Amino acid sequence: VVVIYASMIINADPKLDYSDVLIVPQKSNVKSRKEVCLEVSKTFNNGTSWSGVPIMAANMSTVGTHKMALVLSEYNIVTCLRKGGDYYSSFASANPDKEKYVSLTLGLDAESKLFVDSADIKDPTFICVDVANGYMTEFHNFTRKVREKWPKSILIAGNVVTPEGVEELSKVGVDLVKVGIGSGSMCLTRRVAGVGYPQLSAVLECAQTAEAFDIGIVADGGIIHPGDFAKYFVAGAAFVMAGGIFAGHDECGGEIRHGEHGELRMLHYGMSSKTANEKYNGGLSDYRASEGRTVEVPYRGSVRNTIQEIFGGIRSACSYVGAFDLPSLYTCGTLIKVNRTINNIFENHEI
């Protein structure tokens, strides 16, 4: 009886993260990485079309800035601006030619609700409705309201990590479901709440369900190396969102500090951290725990260097599997489970 009961509450199927797999090389007709095209063209269910590189900078205060959006738009990458209707509107009005590469970000806070009720703006190209727990009925109802207000926008909503979560959001009219709970470098939800899902399995399972409902997923969180972007695309992600890999750059707009040994560092924090709550919510409520980190990351100069590394890594992955573009990376790519992905014996000796 105990065994039967235990099987009801424990799913024993093995679940995988990105560190558990590698992409398998195969015959390739790609002669040079420069032959690989990273731009895609998509038409969504509401008839809206978009072309660009399906990578998104996360809507974190230290990443989703106007400066970041200006630079990433040059590479046709989307920046999900930090939360706030006015923050989006000021960018869109000043840079109408770059609006297609930014997203308005909303939450369940009073400011977001007021903006939806009162804003008189044309449909933004992208809208990201972002909460930590995408399973709440209140979140579903609010997302439906956003869809009704701006029917021509490409609507992103999340986060969830299961096929059931994807199905529920498909019912309220989203185009893209944001997938990932606890996988981000600044997230402590798995430690504090004990909740989460290994990110590779979440993306694989959610992408299959999304395809059945004719929508896509945004794989959000878990990026450590450029190669992880490629793994996301092989797993079926329509877009990949990242925060930590874009942190520490000039475009983040944060204060540059001197570390203990004189090295340059920048502040970076999760949006469920104590720092974020004190800055935007008047402090951490007495019924809540901080579920995000606050760290100082090494100062890395311009984000352009990081973009080159990301693009180069994805192109290299494509060349290894014979893919001339990202849709082909999904159809050609195969992932294999491994015990160890990287030889890091000299990792602390790089110059």
Which residues make up each language-model segment?
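Alpha/beta catalytic cores of nucleotide-metabolism and tRNA/nucleoside-modifying enzymes
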Residues: 3-31, 172, 194-219, 223-351
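Active-site entrance/lid segments in N-terminal catalytic domains of soluble metabolic enzymes
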Residues: 4-216, 244-249, 345
